[in-house]
């Protein structure tokens, strides 16, 4: 099952995405060009959909240029229900949004 279908099945939200799970640059979530004007919202919706519990806060966001690709690297703090806090990183290939 691809990542778009996984999120649709779990949340009922259809995001304009493809590609990987966002855990690394090599597995970046590809955001389609039709999301250009709501890029941040799509990224935030994806992060929320991937977290099973608690809430999160964005710590940093960086636009990274790598050859002909553009990536958003987002670092968050994930506040778990048991009181623990995890730092997590999500990668998004936003190249299509800059064409």
Mark where each language-model region is.
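Alpha-helical structural elements
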Residues: 1, 51, 85-87
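Residue-level signal for the start and early helices of compact helical domains
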Residues: 38, 47, 81-85
